[in-house]
């Protein structure tokens, strides 16, 4: 089956397509895609992943045509608004 792996690195957005075996997990597909060689800053222990915009675990099984998304880490949220709503 075929799946794609996308990583929205601001410096070099990447989308890779790869052929994987039926029943392949998200993590296996990420490994097989080569994205970790292209983007060594990816840390699957710290970054969330999803399939078509929904968070999934690394051991989740895939279906033909799935798009795996590796999300950027949020390093800081700056709350600089002046309202008293929060």
UniProtKB/Swiss-Prot annotation:
Signal peptide: none annotated. InterPro entries: Mopterin_synth/thiamin_S_b, RnfH, RnfH_sf. It holds the Pfam family Ub-RnfH. Coiled coil: none annotated. It comes from the Bacteria. HAMAP family: UPF0125_RnfH. Belongs to the UPF0125 (RnfH) family. PANTHER family: UPF0125 PROTEIN RATB (PTHR37483:SF1). This is Protein RnfH.
């Amino acid at each position: 089956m075929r799946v794609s792996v996308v990583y929205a690195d601001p410096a070099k957005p990447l989308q890779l397509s790869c052929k994987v075996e039926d029943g392949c997990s998200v993590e296996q597909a990420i490994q097989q895609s080569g994205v970790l060689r292209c983007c060594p800053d990816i840390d699957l222990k710290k970054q969330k992943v999803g399939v078509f915009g929904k968070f999934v675990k690394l051991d989740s099984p895939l279906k033909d045509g799935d798009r795996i998304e590796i999300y950027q880490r949020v390093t800081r949220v700056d709350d600089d608004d002046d309202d008293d709503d929060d």
